[in-house]
Amino acid sequence: MRVTTLSTALFALASTAVSAPTAGSSSPGLEVKLTQIDNTRVKAVVKNTGSEEVSFVHLNFFKDAGPVKKVSIYRGQDEVQFEGIKRRLRSSGITKEAVTSLGAGETLEDEFDIASTSDLASGGPVSIRSHGFVPIVVDGKITGYIPYKSNDLTVNVDGGKAAKVTKALSQLTRRTEVTDCKGDAESSLTTALSNAAKLANQAAEAAESGDESKFEEYFKTTDQQTRTTVAERLRAVAKEAGSTSGGSTTYHCNDPYGYCEPNVLAYTLPSKNEIANCDIYYSELPPLAQKCHAQDQATTTLHEFTHAPGVYQPGTEDLGYGYDAATQLSAQDALNNADSYALYANAIELKC
């Protein structure tokens, strides 16, 4: 990993803790209906299927105007590479512009072009779907989560037309004035990297040969192959965090691309293996959490390293934020969920 000094770059993202809503027939849920508009342009209609109004964060979800991952695209069994950004959110102090409210039975609509964040120039049939959890917000604080799931949509892509769609990241250029890693930001990040390496190594050892029930709590299985995979990814994170002059990622101390909105702690560009910290990464997160499953700089950095395929392939997704959402995932989804690794590392460190 290359860290921003006067000539190098540096980047990271943060972990969001949530608590689950009460289970039952009135539990909130979102139904997502995907339809094709024209070639690679898709419409999503998100419906509140619960009996009460819900307010949720729409960043990293439908209605987010940024090039975020709203759907997964598959050719056969293989997922098409996502070429956008993954943003990490703070868990409190969330401002109104990041929140959407839907009454019972109400819907929101979002249109987007899947070719803007994936290479579909080869054309042919692809299948599109989306699932996960979106954070519930009450008085600016994440207090729970809402599960969402879409239909499977099959689209026969015209490759020629898809190739002409402007790529979201091709428009990204670094700002002329970039604050390199120096001063307090450099000091904070250096500490975060050291702590992330320590936590990742501890968690890797625990994953491979530690308490089975603790591993199952976060990854929903005690299968030895899964334990080995988790340990390998965590060791790869530790190795990357321990390198500030080489490695596979570029880590920005600041926001070179302009995606640090008021509620974003950091963001990742997986296709470029870049991570960027936002101002509130430094101002709102402690170096290490003193409470189980709380946000901090170290596990935020660890979380973001798992997103980068250059660290360990494939990079993880954001399928469930925080302990309660992450521990509701299936074993397969937990293995591919960034926060599952961050939460597990925190739990091993604090003996949760």
Swiss-Prot record:
Disulfide bonds join C181-C253, C260-C278, C292-C352. Residues 20-175 form a propeptide. Residues 1-19 form the signal peptide. The active site is at E304. Thermostable. Binds 1 zinc ion per subunit. Zn(2+) binds at H303, H307, D318. Its cofactor is Zn(2+). Its EC number is 3.4.24.39. Belongs to the peptidase M35 family. This is Neutral protease 2. It comes from Aspergillus oryzae (strain ATCC 42149 / RIB 40). The lineage of its organism: Eukaryota, Fungi, Dikarya, Ascomycota, Pezizomycotina.
